[in-house]
């Protein structure tokens, strides 16, 4: 089984809300999401098939999944277990903004640690359990495409690679991480954070004026 994990595209900032923050994509994020279907299509063919498109329930993931699901002619199946660790928080700050406006939080995440208010073990157990169920339900030659979050991708990699910290890897917007599951139970991280298809659309690679305009 091949699990293709796609991080969501760039979402907007939400600072005040009466419930959990659930931002939509920015215009730049919409453009990033449009780049994904062509990349995903290369994983289909021959004996292999893209069997399912699944997504976190959070809007930024569902909206990123939509163009790919439409291209493949598949529904987007929402799986609660793929939600990010921040799902219940009343604010959302894109990581590139947190670097400037919430430096302590940014530094903690970049050091590889979940925010202090997050129940780390519960989050990890939820993600790993959901992935195990996905793989168990698939045929050996299936590819499952999962639209999720940087934290979700990272804790799965932490478990597979035996890493100490839960947030080891930078996972870019719309980047692709591929995990292979063998019939014997072996798990292999085939690629991590593939981003060439959106390289020019990542905030760090864009002139400030262009980022402000889109």
Task: Map each language-model feature to its residues.
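Generic beta-sheet signal
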Residues: 3, 142-151
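Active-site metal-coordination segments of metallo-dependent hydrolases
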Residues: 19-28, 114-121, 168
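Glycine-rich phosphate-binding loop signature in dinucleotide/nucleotide-binding domains
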Residues: 43-49, 134-142
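Short beta-strand scaffold positions
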Residues: 55-56, 125, 147-148
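Phosphate-handling substructures
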Residues: 70-129, 214
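Acidic, low-complexity terminal tails and accessory targeting/binding regions
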Residues: 77-78, 84-97, 136, 140-142, ...
